[in-house]
Structure formats: C-alpha cells, structure tokens
C-alpha cells in the first residue's frame, strides 16, 4: 500500500498515522479536505467511497444526450401501453439528456444496491408482497446514501454542482446503468447484473465534474432464454425487451387508480403489491446473496401474517407496520382494493 492509499484509507476512519511509526495514530478533523489530481484518481476514490457507503457497484458515464434511448422511450409512449402512467411523457427531453437536469453536467455516476431479502413470507397462502417493498422505502434510503457520496465528492475536489436521482425524477436509470457497465437489459426490461442479478435498486448523481468514464463491453447474457416471458401470467412481456405497462401486475396493484379490470381475474397468482414472477424465474437470480442494508429488513410481524390475518387487517395495522414503506404509495385503501380483488380470484 503506498502513502496515498494509506492516507486515504486513514481519512475514512478519521485518523492519520505517522508513516514512520504506525503505532501512533493522531486524530484529524473529520472534514479534512484532500485535493485529488487527475480524472482517474478522482473516479477511483468516488467508486471506492460508493462501496464503503454500502452500494454494491458503481460506474461512471459521460453526461450526454442519448438519442437511441430517447427513441425507444418515444416508441413505448406512442404504443399506448403506459396505462395511466401519464407522467412518463412529462419532461421528455430531460429524461434522455442529463444536461437538461444539471447545468453544465459532465458525468453521470450510477450506483447499484442489492435488496434481495434473507427472509420471506412464512405462509405460502398469504397474499404476496414484492421483495422491493419489504423494508423502508428505497427512495429515502438511497437518497441519504447518494447525498453522502455527493458530500464526499465536494471534499476531494473543487466545488461541484449536481443532483441525486432515485427513480422519482425524469432519468433513464437503466440506460445509464448499462452505459456505466453495471449490467444489461433483460428480456423483462429489468437491468440484470452478473454478480447481483436483478433484485437491485438504481440511483444516479449527475454532476458538473469531469471524470474518467467506463467503457464497458455491453453483452446480452439472456441468450435464448425466455423464462420471464413464459412465466408472466398476464402476457405483459413483449418482444424486443418491451413491457406492456398497462398489462403488468405491478401496474395494476401499485399505479392503477380505480377498479382493476375484470379481465385480470384469476391471473394475479396472489400478488397483493407488485410482482416478482419474471425475476423469480430468471436464472441470474438463482444464487443471490441477501442484502446488507438494515433499513431493508422487513417488520417480522407482517412476515408471519396468515391469510386470515390479512382478512382482518385494519388501517391502524397498516399505518403501524408499513410506516415509511413503499406500500404507502397505494395507501390502505388501495391495498384493500387489491386484497378484495385477490379474494375474487379464487
């Protein structure tokens, strides 16, 4: 380990060692600033810090207009398969051009966070909740982590301007993740990582700082496999990695307002909130390690809930158990609508 690596490592622990006598640590200010030199060094330390914060992977790409991805988004919107998700058409230019989001944007830092749970629902007859919603809302968790990463960048460089994005702003997250070398787009439209599968959250920092950009060799490792397409109970996965959003169980149970169409009766396979069927059958998700994020751990109470418990589930139960959870998006009323629809399913 050279002196630079030692200094950086010790700064992370808020101590600096006398290089001539490593047994005598000396405390230094927590906000000590190092000015790094060179795009390569800056990029290296940003990626290292991302991993230290708990992200599972980090890549960097140039902030620029993405004409191919903009065209694909337009085709999807024009096809009329977005259902009631009209917001997808908003801020179209910003979705494909980060320079419309951050003035003078030069780099997009993409991060990946595993959320695969170590525990599952106990009762196989109980209504199923998507794994992404087991714990605290990922928007909150990842935003906190990204803000820490942003603060770190400000400490190792000249003043930097930027914004953090987690699935709640006009950003083509999967496209940026591919450019950063974090994975490829599967036939179910999900980003798939060879190391982490597809039970992953994505986030970005768009900043006006130039960095060294990853140049990944993007490969499609889906091959001839069609398990996700074959397993989808509503036929929502179309050719060319296109998903019919208006025909997806996740759309009906989370985004859809009003009643769920009668034509979907008998096709939800007991999915109460969201759907993981296309991911559960994916070969790349067969040997996953559970996440290491405490905030994503579920409340043990609802993991133990039986079918009967759900039938007697009250609004006060909902507010207590699912506080700060993704289930707050559909609210108690929406969850009960879904539950009643499932009861008609059988």
Sequence positions of predicted segments:
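Auxiliary alpha/beta "docking" domains used to position bulky ligands
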Residues: 36-221, 260, 269
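Cationic, low-complexity basic patches in intrinsically disordered or flexible, solvent-exposed regions
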Residues: 13
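A short, charged helix-loop
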Residues: 208-211, 247, 252-255
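Short hydrophobic targeting helices and cationic amphipathic motifs
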Residues: 4-6, 10, 19-22, 35
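Alpha-helical scaffold domains
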Residues: 260-346
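Iron-sulfur cluster-binding cysteine motifs and their immediate structural context
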Residues: 52, 227-251, 268-295
């Amino acid at each position: 380990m050279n002196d630079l690596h030692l200094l950086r490592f010790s700064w992370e622990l808020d101590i600096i060692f006398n290089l001539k006598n490593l047994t005598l640590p000396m405390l230094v200010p927590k906000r000590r600033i190092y000015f790094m030199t060179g795009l390569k060094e800056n990029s290296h330390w940003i990626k290292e810090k991302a991993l230290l914060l708990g992200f599972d992977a980090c890549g960097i790409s140039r902030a620029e207009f993405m004409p191919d991805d903009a065209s694909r988004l337009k085709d999807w919107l024009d096809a009329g398969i977005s259902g009631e998700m009209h917001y997808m058409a908003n801020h179209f230019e910003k979705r494909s051009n980060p320079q419309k989001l951050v003035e003078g944007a030069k780099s997009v830092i993409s991060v990946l966070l595993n959320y695969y749970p170590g525990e599952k629902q106990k009762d196989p007859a109980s209504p199923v909740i998507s794994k992404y919603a087991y714990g605290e809302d990922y928007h909150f968790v990842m935003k906190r982590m990204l803000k820490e990463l942003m603060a770190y960048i400000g400490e190792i460089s000249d003043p930097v301007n930027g914004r953090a994005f987690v699935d709640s702003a006009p950003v083509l997250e999967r496209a940026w993740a591919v450019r950063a070398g974090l994975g490829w787009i599967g036939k179910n439209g999900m980003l798939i990582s060879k190391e982490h599968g597809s039970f992953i959250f994505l986030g970005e920092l768009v900043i006006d700082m130039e960095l060294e950009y990853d140049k990944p060799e993007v490969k499609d490792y889906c091959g001839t496999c069609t398990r996700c397409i074959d397993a989808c109970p509503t036929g929502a996965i179309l050719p060319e990695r296109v998903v019919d959003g208006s025909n997806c169980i996740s759309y009906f149970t989370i985004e859809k307002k009003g009643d769920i169409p009668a034509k979907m009766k008998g096709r939800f396979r007991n999915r109460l909130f969201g759907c993981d069927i296309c991911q559960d059958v994916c070969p790349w998700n067969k040997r996953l390690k559970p996440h290491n994020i405490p905030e994503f751990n579920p409340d043990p109470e609802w993991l133990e809930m039986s079918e009967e418990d759900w039938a007697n589930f009250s609004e006060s139960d909902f507010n207590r158990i699912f506080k700060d959870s993704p289930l707050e998006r559909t609210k108690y009323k929406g969850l009960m609508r879904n539950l009643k629809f499932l009861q008609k399913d059988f």
